[in-house]
Amino acid sequence: VRVKTADGETVPLAKPITYRDLFRHTAGFAGYDGLYHQDGFWGKTTRAKSLDWIIRELAKVPIEHQPGDKYTYGMSTAVLGRAIEALSGRTLDQFLRKELFRPLGMKNTRFHLTKRNRKRFQPLSVFEDGDYRAAKPAEDELPYAKEIPLYLGGEGLTSTMADYARFCQMLIDGGKAPGGIQLLKPETLKLIWTDQLGDIPGYDDRKNGNGFGLGFYVLNDFNQYGAEGVFGWGGYHTTHFWIDPKNEMYAIY
């Protein structure tokens, strides 16, 4: 991996990319609409057959800045997904099913919609000309509705409100699944909902009293978005969730 400079040249990494950099999006990987879109990278991902292939192609494209120098929301979570595959010896799909979904009883969460679940998929609406109208069939918009062997770390899962509630409850319960199985250590949870950016530039939402933990936004102060310590994130088609660990509350919408 090399680093893009202001004059269009590239230089070597000044320091290694860490897992913390990947979780807090300070590794330097841009999003699909940034440098990788310009280099035709998005087109490559739609034809990819494995996460390993995507990450190898990603490594050929210069990153935006030196690791740790700036917050740049991008493909870091996809890289984390590949790291899980390399460390576990399993695909990301296999790992999540065994280590997370089964212990939590998340039976309707998967990377690809089955024929049965495709019929259950929530219809989408769009707001145009002052009114709502039905969007085109949802499955036509979603690449993960098709049976392709591609599992990305940061996108692609389909789920239900009930399944995602199980995930949120696990985080409130100190990382424990029903039956007492410890999925995440309490120390890990504290890192997740603690601001990891500090004075690192690039995170525009800091002006609203928000920070960024390990993979989620976090509220550093009580504000219009919620209480201090609340963390959460959004998903496809304006879905969202937040968790308040201190008051043991969560919301999914």
Predicted regions located by residue number:
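Short, small/polar residue-rich loop motifs at catalytic or cofactor-binding pockets
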Residues: 235-237
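Short acidic-glycine loop/turn motifs at beta-strand connectors
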Residues: 128-129, 244-246
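Short, well-ordered beta-strand micro-motif
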Residues: 217-218, 242-244
